[in-house]
């Protein structure tokens, strides 16, 4: 597939997602990095987003709860170029009924080449990157070219 460039803006659109057993870990991470996160636009699945709003007072665009379609809503935003970073603390030791949605979310983040953290260490690396508050060019699939080729 041909690639094109997308610029992640200085003010990032960050999706925050956490499975039930990982919500407190994400809450602790968000509270620790609140001064940095306040400079960006936050999105989250339903329960996680509401917990973050309640604990920090930050504005969060809360989707539906993950099992009710929230993971798919975040995935749709990624494929539309509306999410720049995904912080997704998922529980690798417990299966969830919406595992296919989880896999789809991670697949879309990979397809669209956005930074993804699935644990605290990686999330720290991303937020502490010297590029976190800069505009950054990434390579993404050239969907217009892809579609044109398929419609020949």
UniProtKB/Swiss-Prot annotation:
Active-site residue list: 71 (proton donor/acceptor)
Keywords, sorted A to Z: Lyase
InterPro entries: Methylgl_synth, Methylglyoxal_synth_AS, MGS-like_dom, MGS-like_dom_sf
Listed name of the protein: Methylglyoxal synthase
Known function: Catalyzes the formation of methylglyoxal from dihydroxyacetone phosphate.
HAMAP family according to UniProt: Methylglyoxal_synth
Catalytic activity annotation: dihydroxyacetone phosphate = methylglyoxal + phosphate
Species this chain originates from: Salmonella gallinarum (strain 287/91 / NCTC 13346)
EC nos: 4.2.3.3
Keyword Lyase appears in the UniProt entry: yes
GO-annotated biological processes: methylglyoxal biosynthetic process
Domain MGS-like, first and last residues per copy: 6-152
Pfam families, per the entry: MGS
Family to which the UniProt record says this protein belongs: Belongs to the methylglyoxal synthase family.
GO CC annotation, single: cytosol
Main EC class the enzyme belongs to: lyase
Residues at which substrate binds: 19, 23, 45-48, 65-66, 98
PANTHER family, sorted: METHYLGLYOXAL SYNTHASE
PROSITE patterns xrefs: METHYLGLYOXAL_SYNTH, MGS
Keyword Phosphoprotein: no
GO terms, molecular function: methylglyoxal synthase activity
